[in-house]
UniProtKB/Swiss-Prot annotation:
Catalytic activity entry: adenine + H2O + H(+) = hypoxanthine + NH4(+)
Cofactor: Mn(2+)
Protein name (record): Adenine deaminase
Keywords, comma-separated and alphabetical: Hydrolase, Manganese
Residues of the signal peptide: none
Length: 581
């Protein structure tokens, strides 16, 4: 909270009714997230903060018309890069959905550009109509079993703790470094604690015994629970539970049953990774709240999970509630049950009215293009003709099987087709070739594997969004189409491309680090619409998002089997395995 003597005196005078408030919100039913009660009263706002609740007069009056007033929503864990939008463009989308604050982990751009990537995200998120707080990337690269664009050590991260919008260390995902007492990685945790900062987690598949080891370091939240058992264990051991509902990972329906009146204040709703078209149409954590209510959760509890619970976990003492001394981030809802948003006030200023952005409040210079000039371009070695060949002496192979709407994959051992000593894609068996091409240092590394579940009949999909090292990942029915899609990415300096036959039938440029578009959110939405339409041309008819699903098949810190630029990786062994079983 920024405060000085004059501001404090002015707030006291408004609270004491000696001077008028800047704005007073009248005639509303106020949700008290501390008690769960609905109360009435005028909300007096001065200098962006609430001075008091009671009977007040102000220079400006906002009539809530007997509607429900709740605190602005907080997304406690998300990645801006996954939205493919600059922070400025993203703010225009989120504010319409009542999201006034986000906790962003820039480990995507950090993996591509290191310190420059974090600086880009901090600078590009200044002075926006939402508050963007940063959790520092803890594991860049995610493991030593792949090649990222950068490496961030403890000493690289240390200076960032001085920044007022840096809150802590984000999703510590390298459990093996804790067990093996890796001092460099442990120093990152120590530095966060010494700076009085939060450390949040990423602990899929850990047993209760392993959780003891993990949590003993002072990691107190997790968003990677795959089932009710894991969720309960984390709550029992003192962790905050982040229930995730994004584009690829949809876990709310199965995990929301864990939330009870006695543990709900230790639970949050988050998005993690959500594509812009889903954000625009469906929403952010506002959608998660609606879904939780639909699944039977009390509306007050659901709203607490995206307001006061998140604020308290991250130590934001002036966020997440409607009370004196709190930032005036308010939503006026038509109904509590439907979370239908009429107005949004950010720091006391009405930025959304009747569900529409007030454009005069969004005259912000988006300097992302200029800031991105420091970020690296695609640097990949030219592909040789046989780059995607997978030699086999036996037809029994390790296969990655997609689990729809989950980041987890299944490890299958299956018989495959062989042609002239090499793996041959099988449309009938839905066994396709997949490759990960290193794109940061021109090493020439190419990891090759076999994947099933995409349902591509003729063509290839390639993208530079490939968690977490963000090399190029491509899947397809033929080497020629895979080559075409990959080379098109190089021309665009990153993005998504779909090839069919001898042509690129759809693409989305992501010129900022190969992750973020330079275009407006409406333009990106239209480009994604064209990409989605192109999926039918190559035969994809999936009930999951193929683009985000593909981008997570390269993340080795999530079970069961993934592919990096150095080869096929099995999570259980935490080591590479061969394609041939």
């Amino acid at each position: 909270m920024k405060i000085d003597m004059n501001l404090l005196k002015r707030r006291i005078k408004v609270a004491n009714k000696e001077v008028k408030a800047d704005t007073v919100v009248k005639n509303g039913k106020i949700l008290n997230v501390f008690t769960g009660d609905i109360t009435r009263g005028d909300i007096a706002i001065v200098d962006g903060f609430i001075a008091g609740i009671g009977k007040y007069d102000g220079e400006q009056i906002i009539d809530a018309q007997d509607k429900v007033i709740v605190p602005g929503f907080i997304d406690g864990h998300m990645h801006i890069e996954s939205t493919m939008l600059t922070p400025n463009e993203l703010s225009k989308v989120l504010i319409q959905h009542g999201v006034t604050t986000v906790m962003a982990d820039p480990h995507e751009i950090g993996n591509v550009a290191g310190i420059d990537g974090i600086n880009f995200m901090l600078n590009a998120s200044e002075k926006l109509p939402i508050d963007v707080f940063i959790m520092l990337p803890s594991c860049v690269p995610a493991t030593s079993f792949e090649n990222s664009g950068a490496k961030l050590d403890a000493e690289d991260l240390q200076p960032f703790y001085k920044h007022p919008r840096v809150l802590g260390l984000a999703e510590f995902m390298d459990f093996s470094s804790i067990v093996n007492l890796n001092e460099e990685m442990l120093q990152k945790i120590i530095n966060a604690h010494l700076n009085g900062s939060i450390v949040d987690g990423h602990a899929p598949g850990l047993s209760k015994e392993e959780l003891n080891v993990y949590i003993s370091t002072g990691i107190y939240a997790d968003h990677e629970c795959a089932n009710v058992k894991e969720a309960k264990e984390r709550l029992e051991l003192g962790m905050y539970l982040m229930i995730r509902e994004g584009t690829a990972a949809k876990e709310l329906k199965k995990l929301i049953k864990v939330v009870t009146p006695t543990n709900s204040r230790r639970c949050m709703l988050v998005t993690d990774d959500k594509l812009p078209d889903d954000l625009i149409v469906e929403g952010s954590v506002d959608h998660n709240v609606r879904l939780a209510i639909k699944e039977g959760l009390d509306p007050v509890t659901a709203i607490q999970m995206v307001t006061i619970n998140a604020a308290e976990f991250f130590g934001l003492r002036s966020f997440g509630a409607i009370a004196p001394g709190y930032q005036a981030d308010l939503l006026i809802l038509d109904e509590l049950q439907t979370v239908s948003i009429d107005k949004v006030l950010k720091k006391g200023i009405c930025v959304v009215d009747n569900g529409e952005i007030k454009k005069e409040e969004f005259k912000i210079n988006d300097n992302s293009k200029e800031l991105a000039m420091k970020l690296p371009k695609i640097n990949m070695k030219a592909l040789e003709k046989n780059a995607f060949e997978i030699p086999l002496s036996s037809d029994l192979c390790n296969v990655i099987e997609i689990v729809p709407n989950s980041l987890i994959t299944h490890h299958r051992v299956e018989k495959v087709d062989i042609d002239k000593g090499n793996f041959s894609a099988s449309i009938s068996n839905d066994q396709l070739k997949m490759a990960v091409i290193e794109r940061h240092h021109a090493t020439g590394n190419i990891g090759l594997g076999i994947v099933k579940g995409f349902g591509i009949k003729n063509g290839a999909i390639a993208t530079t969004v490939a968690h977490d090292s963000h090399n190029i990942v491509v899947v397809g029915t033929s080497d020629e189409e895979m080559f075409l899609a990959v080379n098109h990415l190089k021309k665009m300096n990153g993005g998504i491309a779909i090839a069919s036959g001898k042509e690129i039938i759809a693409s989305l440029p992501l010129a900022i680090g190969g992750l973020i578009s330079e275009n407006s959110y409406l333009e990106v939405q239209e480009q994604l619409k064209i990409l989605n339409q192109a999926l039918s041309i190559i035969g994809v008819d999936a009930d999951f998002n193929p683009f985000l699903t593909l981008s997570f098949l390269t993340l080795p810190v999530i079970p069961e089997i993934k592919l990096t630029d150095t080869g096929l990786f099995e999570f259980k062994r935490f080591s590479h395995i061969k394609v041939q079983a």
